[in-house]
Amino acid sequence: MQAKAVARTVRIAPRKVRLVVDLIRGKQVGEAIAILNHTPKTASPVVEKVLKSAIANAEHNYEMDINNLVVEKVFVDEGPTLKRFRPRAMGRASQINKRTSHITVVVSEKKEG
């Protein structure tokens, strides 16, 4: 059985979130939360919040045991890009892309044995 949580349109670039997400893939949830607490990245609290939501969904909706949960899948997709303009020299302007992310965390119970 799997439980899932998604955070959509998070205002952090996907490239930056993927650095954090790659640290917790395949880990037990307790270990994953400990890793996120000690990772000095802006994306860490956001990913931790999504992970805790997935754990709560597993416990409440599917009555899984929290002690046996493993981060099965975690991935980051690109959300809508906010386009802004920055003034440049000689009356020109250049485009600034403010990227957003969709963060998905899937947890499942570890197989016995």
Curated annotation (Swiss-Prot):
InterPro entries: Ribosomal_uL22, Ribosomal_uL22_bac/chlpt-type, Ribosomal_uL22_bac/org-type, Ribosomal_uL22_CS, Ribosomal_uL22_sf. The keyword Thylakoid does not apply. Disulfide bonds: none annotated. GO terms for biological process: translation. PANTHER family: CHLOROPLAST 50S RIBOSOMAL PROTEIN L22-RELATED, LARGE RIBOSOMAL SUBUNIT PROTEIN UL22M. Part of the 50S ribosomal subunit. This is Large ribosomal subunit protein uL22. It comes from Bacillus cereus (strain ATCC 14579 / DSM 31 / CCUG 7414 / JCM 2152 / NBRC 15305 / NCIMB 9373 / NCTC 2599 / NRRL B-3711).
